[in-house]
Amino acid sequence: MKSIPIILLVLIGLLLASVYSHDILITEKGQKSLDKLDKAAATTLQHGENIQLSCDVCQIGASLLEDFIKKNASLTEIIKGLSDLCIASKEEQPEVCTGILNNYVPIIVDVLIQSDFTPSQLCGYFKICSATGSSESSSISNSFDNEYRQESFNKPTMKVNKKPQYKDLSNQEPLVKKFKGNDSIGYILQISDVHFDPDYKVGSNPNCGRPLCCRDGVGSAGPIGHYLCDIPFSTVELIFQHLATLTDQLDFIVWTGDNPPHNVWEQSQAQQELATATLAQVIQKTFPNTPVLPSLGNHEAYPADQYVLPNSQWLLDSIYTYWAPWLDADALELVKERGYYTSLIKPGLRVMSLNTLENDMINFYNLLPTYLKGPNNQSDWMINTLEQAQSNGEKVLIIGHIPCTVKSASTDGWCAMYEQVVGQFSDVIIGQLYGHTHYDQFSVFSDVATHTIPTGMNYIVPSLTTYQNHEPGYRIYQFDYSTNQIVNYYQYHANITEANETGALNFQLTYSAKELYNMDDLSPTSWTKVANQMKTNSTMFNSYFENLSSSPIKESCDQACQTKWICQIFGITSSEFDKCYGV
């Protein structure tokens, strides 16, 4: 999920105010704007991490930056100024302020200097200001959207303008030699967002005032876990002891990333690598003879969410090593070069694992003009792979981490491209399996021309971590290999409160998709019908809402809340969400 605590988003506004000079604070105009900024920031902060950063914070900061953009300051001065402001706000502890700023400010400043964006446009890019707030702020998302739509493809055939040479995929060896199910029916396990914390301490304080707790102090952190914290490694072991009982049923496993904990202010490259290495070892030990299809999460990066080549080559080198037991040489070669790959699951069925750090709004490197259009970019590879699959009579299952929903803090440029690809190859793509939000969601893709014809389905699975009030969960998809279609899925959860009391972690079936929504099949058309019924059928919507967070905290959802969540289903880009929501 979005990893950076709200203080960093507030500091984006503050950074815009001082990125070039701490001297702005001593001017009369700058001081007045700063006073307003402090007040707006405090108002934003007191509502907690799940509330969007106030547009005022960002706009005032942008105004200050634009007034003093010609002045220069060192990174040391910028970080010190921001640290002083952060610590003075008392909304984060000093070590969190300094840790986050030291990690992220050099990247943000470097990107601002290299990019062509004005500070006001950044407020729109980060979705801090809506389209109704500032035409300049909202223009940046539309600019990314339009550039992808107009320049990446030749309409209406969606061919890549300058297609590089890619490997012939027609002779790949399948990963699954023999399926375990009866007749044509098999089962796929998806796990995501484990976020285990090796420093979790039983009996520690879950309300420590930092972005991640249960690591020190005295409090109610239970032996199995706590809803405000990431799970201990001992709980990971319990989870996989349970999953091991499913081995005889599973044909393959989809592992959609986010392995390290949420201590984003004090992480290191070595810690990020160790988290992935540890989980890879656990998975391989638990399922020694079951194929595993991994994808890269935003938390695997260091700092979290930040990815650009060649700076991030260490990350690709590490997953190349840890994913090696499951992927063939061609797939691993592409992993080491780009962080994505394709493999043949069985004749006629292919997987594409995407590197969705390119779809991460909090990856500041995505502001650079080359991220969408560089040589051998991911969108070109994606289209080429789908074209080959289409020619070879194959169906494709897409897996990734960050989905295209407003909840996931995705980028409109990427999602505009992706939406077109899904529409163009709707006869090839049979489903999309993602994670990241920690919520149990789904989104329906439709044709970009009219948004009336369903074209694809994205299934977003809940997390295994309990962080931010979730019961740990995993999902099993029922798959018909004769038609290469997902025909049902089963969502499982464990109750952490009960587990802490009994010492046993028991997973129970929460629901079956077909039974819960009374569906004949899981086609995009059927899911569109379900989503539209939620607009008027409160019973159906309440079933969806209850399973969204799988939280012990039961919240009410009024009409505005209901509309928001339904628009998340249809809003692949922020402009589509806003249109649905009536913004």
From Swiss-Prot:
It comes from the Eukaryota. The keyword Zinc applies. Glycans are attached at residues 72, 182, 377, 495, 500, 537, 547. Residues 1-21 form the signal peptide. It is found in: Secreted. Its EC number is 3.1.4.-. The keyword Zinc applies. Pfam families: ASMase_C, Metallophos, SapB_1. Zn(2+) 2 binds at residues 258, 298, 401, 436. GO terms for cellular component: extracellular region; membrane. Its cofactor is Zn(2+). Keywords: Disulfide bond, Glycoprotein, Glycosidase, Hydrolase, Metal-binding, Secreted, Signal, Zinc. Residues 51-133 form the Saposin B-type domain. This is Sphingomyelin phosphodiesterase A.
